Amino acid sequence: MKKLQYKDGKIFENERMTYKLEGKYNVLRPSGKLVARFKIKNLFSLRGKKQAVIGNLKIEKMKDEPISQAKIINRQVRLIENGENLSLIKEDEFLANFNFGENTLEIYEDEGLAVAIFFALKKLGEK
């Protein structure tokens, strides 16, 4: 398990930067290597609904709802709220735990996907 901390658009592990958000939607390693790219869309058919797209994964959230109410539209990946945390689960395998109150991530598997989803959720949570 890795414990990571989010600060100012960057993710740190033990005070060392491990990921950063470049521009609005590119998740990079400090070396500049692209980890993931996502897009944020406003869904016009439903006012106030935003969608983040990472490959074939779609995350939807209403503007006035908290991040914990976000839903992943994919058969294999799910977000489950447990107390203050959001758990990321893929095919019954626990991938990560996000705490948006403390801006922390606990990553167990598939680090690149978990970090990209965390950044997308942070962007969806912005007003």
Regions found by a protein language model. Name each.
Residues 1-127:
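Intrinsically disordered, low-complexity proline/glycine-rich segments
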